[in-house]
C-alpha cells in the first residue's frame, strides 16, 4: 500500500506538553504502526527506561527497529545528546567489490533519531526526527552485518529468551522469503478502514468531515418541521354544521308547533361557512317517540274504511266513512293552531256552527295541486310525513271546500 493512502487511516496519539504544544507520542510496542507511514513529524517515544549510561540507548533502539528492517548507527554523540541515523544496507550482488561507495546525498537516508538527556526530569528523551527512508527496508540484509551479530550475543548474555526467540523466527522467515509482518488488510465493511496484525486497528488521523452530521441535522430539522406543520394543520378548527334536535320537542309531531321553535338547526360560530346548501336534514324527522305514540293513537282511532271511488282531481282520497265527531275535530284543530305569524285564522262554517281554522301563509306549504298523496304508501318511518301532508292540506281548504271534511278519514287525524 502506498504511503499517501496511509495518511488518512492511521491513528496517532497526541499529547500536550507543559509548554502547551501538541506532540505525537508512541510506545515502543506501537511504534511499528506509527512508522508504517512517511511523515516529517516528531514522534516521541514514551515510556523510555531509565538508562544508566548513554551506551545502553543503542541496544534498546536496535531491539525496536531491527524487526522493521532499519539498521541504526550512531551519527553524533556526546554526554547529553546522541543522534542515530539509518545505515543504507544495499545488496552486494552485481556490484564491483573494488568500487568505493558513493558519498553523495542521494545515497544518504534522511531517517534520524535523537536522544537527549533532560536535567530537569533526570531521564533520557527519545524522539524520531524524520521518518523517511530513501531505500528499501530489508531484514535479511541486516542479519549479515557485524552489529547484528554483536546484538544477538548481547541478548544471550542478558538471557533475554523472549527477544532471542523473536529474532530467530524473523531470521527463519527471512531465509525462506516469508513476510515478516502480516500485511495490512484493507476492509470495505465501512467500520474500519485498515486492520493490522495483532488486532491493531487504524483510525483516521484528522477528524472526519462534519458534512454528514450537518446533513443529518438538516434532514432531522426538516422532518420535525414537517411533522409540526401537519400537527398545526390538524389542530386548526374546521367549519362544521351541527344539527341538533331536542328529543322532547315534538309533542304533536308537527313542525308548525310553537314548541318546535327551539328545534331549529343550531350552527356554531365558525370562521367561514362556504356552502350553506349542504345542510343535512335527514335526522330532523326521525322521532321514534312520536312514531310510537302515533301508532298507538292510530290503533285507537282506526276503523275499517270502506273502499269508494277516487278522483284524480280531488286533493285527498275520498273514502266514505262515518262523519267526524265535533269533539275530535275541536281537539285536532285547537292543538294545531299556533300563535305564529306564519298562520292566519279564518272562520269556516261547519253545519250550524262556525269553526276557526288556521291557514299557513308560507309559500312552501302544500296546496291543492301538489303531490300530497305521494307518500301514502310508504313504510312506517314515513307515516308522519303522510299525516302532516294531509293535515296541512286540510288547513288550506277554502271556505267553499270546507264541507268535504266529512269525507276525511278520522284515522288520518291524530288525537294529539
Curated annotation (Swiss-Prot):
GO CC, any one term: mitochondrion
Localization per record: Nucleus
Superkingdom per UniProt: Eukaryota
Keyword Transcription regulation: yes
Location, primary (coarse class): nucleus
Residues that hold Zn(2+) 2 according to the record: 86, 109, 133, 135
Motif CDC [2Fe-2S] cluster binding motif, chain ranges: 187-189
GO biological process: cardiolipin metabolic process; cellular response to iron ion starvation; intracellular iron ion homeostasis; positive regulation of transcription by RNA polymerase II; regulation of phosphate transmembrane transport
The keyword Flavoprotein is assigned to this record: no
Residue ranges of coiled coil: none
Documented activity regulation: Dimerization via the binding of Fe(2+) or a [2Fe-2S] cluster decreases the DNA-binding activity.
UniProt entry keywords in alphabetical sequence: Activator, Iron, Nucleus, Transcription, Transcription regulation
Binding site for Zn(2+) 1: 53, 55
GO molecular function: DNA-binding transcription factor activity, RNA polymerase II-specific; iron-sulfur cluster binding; RNA polymerase II cis-regulatory region sequence-specific DNA binding
Residues that hold DNA according to the record: 54-55, 58, 74-78, 81, 88, 119-120, 157, 159
Oligomer and partners: Homodimer. Dimerization decreases the DNA-binding activity.
Domains as described in the record: The CDC motif is involved in iron-sensong via binding to Fe(2+) or [2Fe-2S] cluster, which leads to dimerization and loss of DNA-binding.
Function: Transcription factor required for iron homeostasis and resistance to oxidative stress. With AFT1, activates the gene expression in response to low-iron conditions, also called iron regulon. Recognizes the consensus iron-responsive element (Fe-RE) sequence 5'-CACCC-3' in the promoters of target genes. The transcription activation by AFT1 and AFT2 depends on the mitochondrial iron-sulfur protein biosynthesis pathway. In high iron condition, the presence of iron leads to dimerization, which in turn leads to a decrease in DNA affinity.
Name the UniProt record assigns to this protein: Iron-regulated transcriptional activator AFT2
Organism ancestry: Eukaryota, Fungi, Dikarya, Ascomycota, Saccharomycotina
Encoding gene (name): AFT2
